[in-house]
Amino acid sequence: MDPKLLDILACPLTKGPLVLSEDKSELISKQAGLAYPIRDGIPVMLESEARALNVDERLDK
């Protein structure tokens, strides 16, 4: 994922920052507690496509 794109993307629910997951397959919104998938290099920024973070993921800094 292009770092410039990551700088301008925000969570569609909270408008907060997103963090690229360690395996680079998801964009994580800690505020919303959601992980948005990245498919074929394109972030899918739909709440209906996001998965809820588990407790450990929400607390992981």
Swiss-Prot record:
HAMAP family: UPF0434. This is UPF0434 protein PSPA7_2181. One of its GO terms (cellular component) is cytosol. InterPro entries: Trm112-like (IPR005651). It holds the Pfam family Trm112p. Belongs to the UPF0434 family. SUPFAM superfamilies: Trm112p-like. Gene3D superfamilies: 2.20.25.10.
